[in-house]
Structure formats: C-alpha cells, structure tokens
Amino acid sequence: MNNEFMKRAIELSIESVKNGGGPFGAVIVKDDKIIAEGSNQVTSTNDPTAHGEIVAIRNACKKLNDFSLSGCEIYSSCEMCPLCLAACYWSRIDKIYYANTREDARKIDFDDSFIYSEINKNISERKIPMTQMMRDEALKAFELWDKKTDKVKY
C-alpha cells in the first residue's frame, strides 16, 4: 500500500473532471512503479466501457504486451463498479486499493447497485431481455477451440 500511488489516482480523477470526464482515475503498479494510468473517458470517446480502471488496464496490458496483470496492483479513486471489478478478475490483478466508496459515488449519481442486483437474478428476471438462439451453430466455435492444441488459455 502506497499513498503516492493513490494520490496519483485521485489526481487523475480531478484532472478528468476538469477536462469534461467523469470523476474516476486509476493507476496500475508493478514492482513498486506505476506502469499505466487511466481516467474516465466515457463521454470523450463515446465508449461506455472507458472507465478509468478499464483504461488503465488496457494501457498496462499494452505496455506489458500481455493480457495478464498478475503481479500488479491497481489503485482506484473509487470502489469499482461491476464492469471494472470483472476486468480486474479477468486480468488477474493481485490487489485492489480504492478511495471513495460505492456509496460516495451513488451520492453524486453514479449508482451501480442496480447492476449488482441484476447480476444475481435469473436470466428471465433481468430488465434487459435475453433470448438464446442458434446454440448448435455457435457450439462449432467452442468445439474448434476445445480441439485446438496451440490455444492460449485465459
């Protein structure tokens, strides 16, 4: 745990607000050095996935030329939404540090509690309708993957 890393994540969140973005920033740390930074770019890029943490993860993976961030930590200006938390698991980040809480974010209209609630529901109960179709055709790609001898597992 390093206050300087968190200070940088917070600086990025403040800079983001001043530049028209959302109030979120993050840094990725490996071997006690910042290797990547990110701030919220949702509105500037018209990309709803361009959260500060996601941008930092993308930058770190690009810098390391690896999809795995094992051995890395992330410092975020806020407790993560489900999207960013999932990205941390998928990228294998070792540890998450955060400053503001989900409740702090909710108070300024960044409320993601409905997503946490939706994830726990059965597919048939979710607000966005989900319909399965063409499974047999789609399974062909899975069968090819399963038989592939040179696949890179992730």
Where are the regions a protein language model picked out?
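Zinc-dependent deaminase
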Residues: 1-19, 80, 87-154
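Short beta-strand scaffold segments in enzyme catalytic cores
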Residues: 24-32
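Short secondary-structure boundary/capping segments
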Residues: 26, 65-66, 120-122
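Small-residue (primarily alanine) positions within well-ordered alpha-helices
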Residues: 9, 13-16, 26, 52, ...
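Short beta->alpha transition motifs characteristic of CBS
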Residues: 35-42
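Active-site phosphate/pyrophosphate-handling residues
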Residues: 4, 33, 55
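Residues at secondary-structure transition points
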Residues: 23, 43-51, 79, 125, ...
